[in-house]
UniProtKB/Swiss-Prot annotation:
This is Tubby-related protein 4. The gene is TULP4. WD repeats lie at residues 6-72, 73-115, 116-158, 159-237, 238-276, 277-334, 335-372. The SOCS box domain mediates the interaction with the Elongin BC complex, an adapter module in different E3 ubiquitin ligase complexes. Expressed mainly in the brain, skeletal muscle, testis and kidney. It comes from Homo sapiens (Human).
Amino acid sequence: MYAAVEHGPVLCSDSNILCLSWKGRVPKSEKEKPVCRRRYYEEGWLATGNGRGVVGVTFTSSHCRRDRSTPQRINFNLRGHNSEVVLVRWNEPYQKLATCDADGGIFVWIQYEGRWSVELVNDRGAQVSDFTWSHDGTQALISYRDGFVLVGSVSGQRHWSSEINLESQITCGIWTPDDQQVLFGTADGQVIVMDCHGRMLAHVLLHESDGVLGMSWNYPIFLVEDSSESDTDSDDYAPPQDGPAAYPIPVQNIKPLLTVSFTSGDISLMNNYDDLSPTVIRSGLKEVVAQWCTQGDLLAVAGMERQTQLGELPNGPLLKSAMVKFYNVRGEHIFTLDTLVQRPIISICWGHRDSRLLMASGPALYVVRVEHRVSSLQLLCQQAIASTLREDKDVSKLTLPPRLCSYLSTAFIPTIKPPIPDPNNMRDFVSYPSAGNERLHCTMKRTEDDPEVGGPCYTLYLEYLGGLVPILKGRRISKLRPEFVIMDPRTDSKPDEIYGNSLISTVIDSCNCSDSSDIELSDDWAAKKSPKISRASKSPKLPRISIEARKSPKLPRAAQELSRSPRLPLRKPSVGSPSLTRREFPFEDITQHNYLAQVTSNIWGTKFKIVGLAAFLPTNLGAVIYKTSLLHLQPRQMTIYLPEVRKISMDYINLPVFNPNVFSEDEDDLPVTGASGVPENSPPCTVNIPIAPIHSSAQAMSPTQSIGLVQSLLANQNVQLDVLTNQTTAVGTAEHAGDSATQYPVSNRYSNPGQVIFGSVEMGRIIQNPPPLSLPPPPQGPMQLSTVGHGDRDHEHLQKSAKALRPTPQLAAEGDAVVFSAPQEVQVTKINPPPPYPGTIPAAPTTAAPPPPLPPPQPPVDVCLKKGDFSLYPTSVHYQTPLGYERITTFDSSGNVEEVCRPRTRMLCSQNTYTLPGPGSSATLRLTATEKKVPQPCSSATLNRLTVPRYSIPTGDPPPYPEIASQLAQGRGAAQRSDNSLIHATLRRNNREATLKMAQLADSPRAPLQPLAKSKGGPGGVVTQLPARPPPALYTCSQCSGTGPSSQPGASLAHTASASPLASQSSYSLLSPPDSARDRTDYVNSAFTEDEALSQHCQLEKPLRHPPLPEAAVTLKRPPPYQWDPMLGEDVWVPQERTAQTSGPNPLKLSSLMLSQGQHLDVSRLPFISPKSPASPTATFQTGYGMGVPYPGSYNNPPLPGVQAPCSPKDALSPTQFAQQEPAVVLQPLYPPSLSYCTLPPMYPGSSTCSSLQLPPVALHPWSSYSACPPMQNPQGTLPPKPHLVVEKPLVSPPPADLQSHLGTEVMVETADNFQEVLSLTESPVPQRTEKFGKKNRKRLDSRAEEGSVQAITEGKVKKEARTLSDFNSLISSPHLGREKKKVKSQKDQLKSKKLNKTNEFQDSSESEPELFISGDELMNQSQGSRKGWKSKRSPRAAGELEEAKCRRASEKEDGRLGSQGFVYVMANKQPLWNEATQVYQLDFGGRVTQESAKNFQIELEGRQVMQFGRIDGSAYILDFQYPFSAVQAFAVALANVTQRLK
């Protein structure tokens, strides 16, 4: 045979484990019974009793397979005993568990519907020496030390009892194999025999000097007569039908042996109690514990060595270790297992068909793997290698065949799952939600205030093996407010030792096992009021179990001990925040590492923010809002906003700069941060996230508030802009800043706040006035200069950034290629929040937004970034990890700047990945820096501007909507990506629609799509990548319309799209210099959001400054929206041939975006059209890049048309075509269509998609050429209907003809919004698809803008929407708006979009899109008119609810995809039921909660409970939670709840 202790961390409880008992799994139904019994014993349950009076029931498995599913709950801590549990005994036939404590209390537990409850209670006040079930499980033998013995039935009826008068105590009692007699052992070496009816049969003296420690038979513990041992049982050991159930083995062939162990360590093997010549085993061990395996052929004897005394002088303690010896039925020694255990082994038991031997020593539990046969060489090698490796992860380093590696890894698969999967990395365990349905059952205990520590401390323990494993510690840091810091519970021990072997010694030595911190948790005490106790009313001793009795004096001591427990370290490094600095922490070096999160509150304790302090955690971990009745007579209403926390690469982790002091006191709307709250460049993280913005779902919140709330929640995504940009951001930012200034001097020039967000922002105004290109030209001049001047420089920057970000040879080679990082766009979106209040938008990143718009001139060659190039583009390098987190700046309801971090999504990746290879590319990047600069000043101006007419969004939120839209787009992260991909796919699917949409976007914005055409000029490198995020900016379109229906809203819009995303970044200066592209992109979005006109202006300006328009191929960061196609479920939407095309960058072709001076090409907004069909792609593309900034007329708008039909997917890709066509397209800058652009914000596809996508040349027809476009002037009514029609029906047909014939003609399809997207409907089908796609896209991205503007347009059909659209707000593409508008649009369109959505897994853009990220976009939408759409779909009761629905949807469908980075779950507590009898509100906690309290609550998500909290003692609570809660988040919510001024 062979035996070895299992590898892996030592399993520990918080107190000494005193007894063990194991049982196999029970078949769940009759159908399972015929299955081989062996399977039943691969899984089982281990019962443990400990010194804290808690019984642990823990799941075990021996199959060594990780793929096997485990029960949702693998550990139960059963409380109820008043003193240490000394005996646990399973009754396998009846599936009951008997437990006895030191005071004589006996509980019989039974499990029903997943919960354990006490069935029987017996307490006669005397110590129980033994409790044994008969072999058939029908009777129980109870023996007391005072000589009283009792036999009762399994149901609790007493059969007989007797008082045995002895001078010594009874130490043990057992049944004979036939259950006809009972034997008792005494402390004076005697054996007393009685029959099953209580008649005395004999007294036998076995040993004169040694007392009997224990007795047992080498016979199965239970005999179960069931059909499980049927002929179908293939088990080798299958016993006869009446064989032992536990381990069916032909035991009957072996004559039963009575085994008696004595205090001396000797063991006698007897045929019967009267055997005169027993076989004596002299083990040489002290404190012996012996047990036969169930098969009856192997006796395990565990004890401490005696011979160690020889070496005791020098190092006796080291030699003194426990060992296990194995003997056969003849008493022959077979094997000795030496262990490193240096404490006595208190209890052992066999399990899993004798393949495991479980040993308890102190608080530690050891699992020994036993091989009964001669061990194979393979097994010996496995154990030798495993003991050398020590860790499972090292197996992969060996050069072994896969089968051997797999076999070797089984040595590391634990029989009992450890509480923390990786003891060396507990941070991950507490920071991220558990996978699947795994639920963590914890206990939270308050420890007394300690002067050293400061305020009261709470420790969160994970229930395990009947004990508590500390995983988090919280300390109150303010006497005025319920504010806490959450930290690691570690003390001086090394992190890896916390739960390792050192834990045992520390717990044992420091806590002496009896005072470990848990017990005070009052696990024992909690049960004091347990119903089981009350049921024991018939027991005379019941009062002893009363609560008073349970309040043992140990409690305070234990509490103190707890605070000293090595596992509850006292050291608390200071985080550096003023509130924390007052405390002194000895371990300054660990300071940053020890604080994980902070819970901040308003003065009233009704709103809480959970802020991540650790570098690896998102800054925003959630928020809790309480709403109570005036008199506190009704249960409180809790609303929890919980951002999903996903693990991200450390590369993208940024230390969040969170100001815990920033908390809006009572004002819900007042964020603490001011306009400057959004740092210009580097300090993106400094922005505070006000708590006030968060509102309970039950409360009405302004759109702004909603947005702020969502965004702040999104903050959970962590991080900072810098994260997004990474190092490159810093550099790029700096460089860009310089460039920006240069590039966007106009911004400064147009100091006019609304006007100049980006140097060209003024453009909007200009455009408004002069729809013609003329306006654009002026900015163009400066812009061009910028472009030109920066063209090289930017080019360099971009190149640099491209190289840095996406080390792609292509980019480097292209040198000029501008790399617009989608991520920046995303960040921009953050900034965009400014929405509602113009002033509010402090430095809204709007100014930053512009960069993307103009991709500086890039060589026409670049324009066509081929798929390959695009792939290059995906500067995923920057944040290739998608991400870590991106910091989003938003404005809360009061207009304060709020910064939130959200995990970057792949989308992000794609965004920043897009780099324009063109030489002029850098120009775009340049923009970024400028954007940053300009944005701030302009931001607010822009905001004002936007707020005014620009965004006619229904609510005052419009400004934010754009931001939000961009944010949403990015916040949507995956969702947005989905959107984009959706759009993409949609386009693919419905090339027509997509084309239309693209065209619309392109057209609306101005045929900027011409950008591609622009490539004609050599710099046509228009093929800039449109920022994926920029699409969100599209909503700025509304701003354009806001400028005036007739004014060139288009231009503004266009800029908006692109700028919006960038803006937010600029605000934060997210872009690292290397990531200049990125910077520009984000900034652009933001800025655009803030001021579309400005943004556009900026963008246009830049191109103007740079090379001539034609030359300046705007390197729009073409959102890699299409990239997501593959990544997002949405791809599904257009999984048709179109889908493939979608991936083509055709839509992206827009890159050359010619932005008229006035028109900012908002790449972000441009919907990407996948190159579905050649012709349509072009159109699609256009829509995709609705920006079509009217570059000086030269931008190849016209060419696009030409190109469009032909290249559609691929030609569009080739910027050259567009470039060639550059002439006509000149998008008439002021043309409202530019707005249209905005309306169609493209989603950001995954970087891969992006790269594959090319910017399809948008048919940038001279705006004049579009009759449809002009209608855009009044997008609200006219255009919308027209586009509607086009999109909806003719979408393909009429426009197709138009577009197709025109190719230049852009049919403005205001699919989702009233963006007049110029769709080259070269391919009538394409347009339709485009439209659908665009719709969807818009829905998401544009919904905000669309809600307003699109609404209006659709309102063309729907008047109400028209109201918002009046300003071309429709162009603002806010996802919600878009959705609403879409809905309004026409049922037909709606149906289409729905179908599309289905394809994409989105039911309805607005509803199906699970914008889990609830980027401000959704919130905004919700707050705004889009809220109607949202509500109409889900009729959420409040914005919070809307978010919730969104989150829910996303979570449901994303499967972690959409929600992976930034979904915000909105949950509420379950309303308790009123109990008339007791006059209290009650909840069903499944027996886990033993005291009624107003603080008890349960949280539900989608109808299933995901968290529950309840009191079990005066200072102890239970806390159970599962996904989406991480331990840190759940603990923070519990701390917030505990401080409520309620009973």
